[in-house]
Amino acid sequence: MVREQYTTTTEGTHIQRPENQCVYKIGIYGWRKRCLYLFVLLLLIILLVNFALTIWILKVMWFSPTGMGHLRVTKDGLRLEGESEFLFPLYAKEIHSRVDSSLLLQSTQNVTVNARNSEGEVTGRLKVGPKMVEVQSQQFQINSKDGKPLFTVDEKEVVVGTDKLRVTGPEGALFEHSVETPLVRADPFQDLRLESPTRSLSMDAPKGVHIKAHAGKIEALSQMDIIFQSSDGMLVLDAETVCLPKLVQGTQGPAGSSQRLYEICVCPDGKLYLSVAGVGTTCHEHSHICL
């Protein structure tokens, strides 16, 4: 409030003019002043609350000059100590654990690792789920510590690079198509069975098929015929004793039967040949085949 007072007198007279007072009011008064104070007080309260929340967040998140919590920012990248949980996809060029500990990736549902090209398309995927492990790629390969391929799979073939492939299941191995291998053998003192329940079983090799049993016997069982056929060579039974225990015994036929009979003859080197049967042996007459 400004108050101005003007008093004038005239020389030689004692008459005093009436006092002239002018009052000017400058400022905010009334409800406006109260609202202004209330607004300023509200701003101070909000400022204090924000400052307290900032201090609380810094304390809870363990912010420090080197990082946040277990997350440390180094010149080589980011370093996490302890267990970490990612709620959204993680994009990284390289992930490795400490020298003295292993790397563990764990999820309640599945763990998926994707490889993308420059256009963002998935070119390779590894998915570990609760019931299966799925690999989606053009080629899947497992190498040894020295870089040697141990197991390779693509659309055309499966290659096992180890010296030995061992199947320990009670039902063995089931192959729907052909198998190419230089050697098939069982474990020591175990039986080797090659079986085709509903179809035929064929073994082919350009330089021969060798079947050996060093400490046991070899059995070939068939409900129908067993045929041994050699187109250019011979069938050799190299044994001290050859037994045919279940040959059918012949019966006496009518006299003068025109049925032709043969006898089996043996050369000194073990070769067998047939000779027309007669009243006596005729092997000597046809022995020129042994020459």
From Swiss-Prot:
An example Gene Ontology biological process: heart contraction
Residues modified by glycosylation: N110
Coiled coil: none
Bilayer topology term: Single-pass type II membrane protein
Family recorded in the similarity comment: Belongs to the sarcoglycan beta/delta/gamma/zeta family.
Cysteines engaged in disulfide bonds, as pairs: C265-C290, C267-C283
PTM annotation: Disulfide bonds are present.
Extracellular side: 59-291
Protein name: Gamma-sarcoglycan
A Pfam family matched in the record: Sarcoglycan_1
Binding partners and assembly: Interacts with the syntrophin SNTA1. Cross-link to form 2 major subcomplexes: one consisting of SGCB, SGCD and SGCG and the other consisting of SGCB and SGCD. The association between SGCB and SGCG is particularly strong while SGCA is loosely associated with the other sarcoglycans. Interacts with FLNC.
Organism lineage string: Eukaryota, Metazoa, Chordata, Craniata, Vertebrata
InterPro entries: Sarcoglycan, Sarcoglycan_gamma/delta/zeta
Location of the protein in the cell: Cell membrane, Sarcolemma; Cytoplasm, Cytoskeleton
Function text: Component of the sarcoglycan complex, a subcomplex of the dystrophin-glycoprotein complex which forms a link between the F-actin cytoskeleton and the extracellular matrix.
GO cellular component: cytoplasm; cytoskeleton; sarcoglycan complex; sarcolemma
Record's keyword terms, sorted: Cell membrane, Cytoplasm, Cytoskeleton, Disulfide bond, Glycoprotein, Membrane, Signal-anchor, Transmembrane, Transmembrane helix
Gene that encodes it: SGCG
Chain ranges passing through the membrane: 38-58
Origin species: Canis lupus familiaris
